């Protein structure tokens, strides 16, 4: 009899393991790949069997069990737990001058060493620390006071993007921990909610008769501290890793390598992290990030700069509340009080009807603000804002000013409510609400206001970056009926443009508007700018032609896998949704556009006029990068090379999976030495770093790569 009990126990343990693995596989198929293999009823039956077995045998309940993911036990209270490594805050600067001075001080502390910097968005969420022990997620904490945080493990387990176990991934990626499972991996990052998820949540709130949430940060902070994980599971809180706490058995000598390792383990990392060899390049890149901010799917309140090298971080050390190797350039929130003079509605490039507040001009953060966003009809209703009201206007993270509240005590007389239009103000099409009920749109593809906005965006710096194609020129081309779509721009010629006339203001006694010829010089400049944009590539095209939810970053992620027009047209929604960070909403929007009559025609027309509808080559995935010849290697090139320029050798090293460094150190795997190699060669030899000639490098690695 005792033997029978042991056999039964082994059999039950085996069945539990089988169910956990099987249900987790179905979760990935359903949530990540959008390709379920079983019905909801079959899934529920498997989950019910596992739940019953775990209730009967609690000792067999595994940390990665799907029963621990959603609908775990309600906790009685949040328990405070000490951080193994203090979770410090970041010092802030509020101007580029302050930022440059802070970075200069940091570099001076390293006494002349070359310093590489990383730059990333400062996501406006809630700081969190997530701990894996021997590959299993065991603990998640808030920052708290930096020394002690609240245990929010029950809620963090509901984040579907976050793996409960990293053991298999660690074994599959030996560069992370030498082929072992890390004893301790503690990732630090930001818990947050996207703008779209907040909009969806607020629809549910309103339908249930509850007040909508004001912003993503507040709802995130409240949600992760709830005692019932079922509520957290319903709100789609997400996580980005941007740093580390305690690490035991993890191989990484710098921040960028650490993030690559974390990503290989399936943990989401902060988006668009960029490494620069010096602070000057990093500071210059701020402008580019600011251009992309309005298209981000989440709120940010600054940009963070970090010393990349862990060795240099150790030298710099920490203060009582913050590390000395990181500094934030923060967008301070500025407010001002003014009067709402009028509300108008604008038609966007995808047909979205956006209400705009016209204000008595007021100075905010050295900028005169006379217009501000009111977002949508629901926001007008929530604020109960009316023409004539005294309002508070805020200018912060994403630059665009917005009305945040009404000073109702200053409303001394009755003011009429704003009536949102039922028809498009430009084409008189009946307006419709999205399925989610948040946005109101004009669905007329021939709406002239949409065409104008689409063409303006197409020519903008974040679009195809066409010099000379601004709002006035777009208005002129539309007025003269020279363009009806994007492809028409590429059919324009200098002669017909030069003969156009447009109204200009003549200064002088009694200013007046006169008709002035566009002229050959303007025409040649515009046509040259249009022609130059032909080779921007497929990612740039996709993000420029006003497809809903497809901005520059999303387009890059998609074209890394579907890198030409044929591949893109053959892609199914589930194929696109399987790409990390894409999801069903974006995938369905793109597929709908590609296979619609107007969308298909747009792509074909651009292809026909010679616009490049592909990327040079597909970008390697993290798995593919790990198999490249120089994966994980730090390489320095010095001296005059015969077959490469400085930029070409750097690009080639990176194409082969390596990291092109600017200075020699103990971390350097090898030095490529050309003629007149100089001091870097001397230093490499003194440190025992391997030295390759240019021919050695070509023979060893160019052959491997072909």
Curated annotation (Swiss-Prot):
The active site is at 122 (n6-amp-lysine intermediate). It comes from the Bacteria. NAD(+) binds at residues 40-44, 89-90, 120, 143, 190, 306, 330. Its EC number is 6.5.1.2. Pfam families: BRCT (PF00533), DNA_ligase_aden (PF01653), DNA_ligase_OB (PF03120), DNA_ligase_ZBD (PF03119), HHH_2 (PF12826). Its cofactor is Mg(2+); Mn(2+). The keyword Manganese applies. GO terms for cellular component: cytosol. The keyword DNA repair applies. GO terms for biological process: DNA repair; DNA replication. One of its GO terms (molecular function) is metal ion binding. Disulfide bonds: none annotated. It catalyses: NAD(+) + (deoxyribonucleotide)n-3'-hydroxyl + 5'-phospho-(deoxyribonucleotide)m = (deoxyribonucleotide)n+m + AMP + beta-nicotinamide D-nucleotide. CDD domains: BRCT_DNA_ligase_like (cd17748), LIGANc (cd00114). Zn(2+) binds at residues 424, 427, 442, 447. Keywords: DNA damage, DNA repair, DNA replication, Ligase, Magnesium, Manganese, Metal-binding, NAD, Zinc. Coiled coil: none annotated. Residues 625-706 form the BRCT domain. Belongs to the NAD-dependent DNA ligase family. LigA subfamily. DNA ligase that catalyzes the formation of phosphodiester linkages between 5'-phosphoryl and 3'-hydroxyl groups in double-stranded DNA using NAD as a coenzyme and as the energy source for the reaction. It is essential for DNA replication and repair of damaged DNA. This is DNA ligase. It comes from Rhodopirellula baltica (strain DSM 10527 / NCIMB 13988 / SH1). The lineage of its organism: Bacteria, Pseudomonadati, Planctomycetota, Planctomycetia, Pirellulales. The gene is ligA.
């Amino acid at each position: 009899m005792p033997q029978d009990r042991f056999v039964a126990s082994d059999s039950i343990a085996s069945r539990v393991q089988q169910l956990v693995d099987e249900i987790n596989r179905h979760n990935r198929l359903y949530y990540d790949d959008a390709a379920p293999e079983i019905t909801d009823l079959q899934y529920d039956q498997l989950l019910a069997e596992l739940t019953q077995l775990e209730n009967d045998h609690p000792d067999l309940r595994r940390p990665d069990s799907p029963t621990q993911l959603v609908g775990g036990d309600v906790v009685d209270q949040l328990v405070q737990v000490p951080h193994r490594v203090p979770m410090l805050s970041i010092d802030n600067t509020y101007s580029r001058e302050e930022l440059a001075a802070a970075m200069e001080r940091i570099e001076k502390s390293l006494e002349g060493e070359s310093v590489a910097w990383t730059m990333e968005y400062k996501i406006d969420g809630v700081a969190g620390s997530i701990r894996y022990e021997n590959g299993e997620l065991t603990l998640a904490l808030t920052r708290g006071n930096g020394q002690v945080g609240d245990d929010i493990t029950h809620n963090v387990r509901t984040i579907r993007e976050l793996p409960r176990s990293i053991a298999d991934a660690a074994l599959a990626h030996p560069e992370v921990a030498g082929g072992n499972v890390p004893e301790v991996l503690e990732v630090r990052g930001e818990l947050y909610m996207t703008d779209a998820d907040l909009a969806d949540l607020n629809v549910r709130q309103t339908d249930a008769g509850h007040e909508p949430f004001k912003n993503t940060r507040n709802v995130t902070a409240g949600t992760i501290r709830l005692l019932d994980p079922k509520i957290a599971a319903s709100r789609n809180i997400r996580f980005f890793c941007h740093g580390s706490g305690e690490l035991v058995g993890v191989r990484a000598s710098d921040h960028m390598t650490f993030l690559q390792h974390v990503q290989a383990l399936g943990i989401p990392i902060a988006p668009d992290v960029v490494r620069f060899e010096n602070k000057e390049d990093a500071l210059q890149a701020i402008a580019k990030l600011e251009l992309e901010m309005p298209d981000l799917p989440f709120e940010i309140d600054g940009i963070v700069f970090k010393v990349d090298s862990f060795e240099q971080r150790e030298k710099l050390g920490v203060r009582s509340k913050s590390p000395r190797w990181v500094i934030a350039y923060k967008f301070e929130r500025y407010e001002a009080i003014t009067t709402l003079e009028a509300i108008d509605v604008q038609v966007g490039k995808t047909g979205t009807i956006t209400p705009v507040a016209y204000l008595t001009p007021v100075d905010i953060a050295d900028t005169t603000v006379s217009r501000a966003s009111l977002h949508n009809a629901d926001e007008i209703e929530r604020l109960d804002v009316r023409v004539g009201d005294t309002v508070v206007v805020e200018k912060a993270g994403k630059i665009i000013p917005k009305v945040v509240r009404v000073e109702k005590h200053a409303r001394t007389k009755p003011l009429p409510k704003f009536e949102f239009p039922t028809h498009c103000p430009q084409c008189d099409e009946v307006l419709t609400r999205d399925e989610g009920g948040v946005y109101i749109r004009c669905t007329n593809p021939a709406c002239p206001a949409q065409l104008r906005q689409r063409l303006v965006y197409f020519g903008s710096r974040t679009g195809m970056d066409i010099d000379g194609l601004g709002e006035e020129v777009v208005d002129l081309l539309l007025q003269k009926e020279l363009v009806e779509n994007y492809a028409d721009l590429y059919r324009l010629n200098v002669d017909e443009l030069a003969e156009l006339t447009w109204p200009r203001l003549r200064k002088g006694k009694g200013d007046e508007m006169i008709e002035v010829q566009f002229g050959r010089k303007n025409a040649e400049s515009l046509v040259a700018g249009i022609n130059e944009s032909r080779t921007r590539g497929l990612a740039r095209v996709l993000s420029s032609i006003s497809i809903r939810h497809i901005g520059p970053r999303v387009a890059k992620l998609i074209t890394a896998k579907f890198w030409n027009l044929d591949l893109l047209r053959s892609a199914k929604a589930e194929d696109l949704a399987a790409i990390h960070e894409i999801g069903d909403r974006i995938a369905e929007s793109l597929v709908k556009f590609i296979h619609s009559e107007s969308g298909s025609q747009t792509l074909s027309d651009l292809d026909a006029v010679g616009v490049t509808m592909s990327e040079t080559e597909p970008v390697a995935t993290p798995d593919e990068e790990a198999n490249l010849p120089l994966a994980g290697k730090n390489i320095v090139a010095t001296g005059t090379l015969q077959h490469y320029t400085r930029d070409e050798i750097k690009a080639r090293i990176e194409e082969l999976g390596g990291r092109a460094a600017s200075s020699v150190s103990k971390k350097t795997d090898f030095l490529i030495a050309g003629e007149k190699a100089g001091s870097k060669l001397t230093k490499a030899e003194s440190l025992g770093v391997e030295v390759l000639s240019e021919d050695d490098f070509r023979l060893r690695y160019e052959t491997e790569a072909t």
